[in-house]
């Protein structure tokens, strides 16, 4: 047990994920990974490694009584650990019926929206700046490897092969260096120790964590990878999780370096301020102009600058499409913008190029400007 706790502390310290000044909201489903996260975070709070810890559970109401039992289990877990508890009810099926969206996509969006709202209220209650707050998720080595294979199958950019980030804004994944099997063993050993200072909860059937039966349905992409592909890969390499995670960390380190270079390059090749209104405050959503110098960059750097530019315009949660990045780089040839080039890309953004550069802006702004011209 000490090894798991020590490994998590090492990850938090080395990656500078959080400290005693950071209140932490845990996203807890009741499964083995998030249940272990709750126990570990409770210990880290007691040791002064983290600020005040609270639990959040989002009930999607997709599995009837089982979903309600999950919520009751997590609430009991919070009570036993003497930690604040947030419960959010979401009608995912109702939203899917109204919008036609995928259930998993709605569930993910609602979970993170609920976490953002709960973290804001938690920090306000503690009189702590929101920027200090952290949201801990229970993603493990297993999740990271599964994401790697999923992206390998459907395709991704070079940075996508780093898989999950240890931190993305307030969202932190402190268990990415720990396997699911290790976490389950940690819970079992904690239960066997029967230590009143380190309590363990059971559900109504005596289980140490909740199992979601739908996780075994291999018609779902992640479950297919988890139950079909990863076990086959482990036959060839029993140390698959450690091996692939080391490789992903190497990719991540190089990706970070290239991001720094791209950020520096953006200051030279991206103009966010309208030259007719030089004193106007920058609003990313207004778009920008990629200056002619952009066309002289190596194509991989063009792609990265275009990607980061679109992230700013579309918002940090947007999944930037490869086709949008390609449409931008296609607006340059022979080291300069292609005059007369136009396009319509993700987010209903308009592309238009002349010798001054390639403009990226909302389609409504583009049309208004064209009328004035």
Pin down the residues of each PLM region.
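Core alpha/beta nucleotide-donor-binding catalytic domains of modification enzymes
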Residues: 1-228
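AMP-forming adenylation/ATP pyrophosphatase catalytic core
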Residues: 4-32, 49, 54, 90, ...
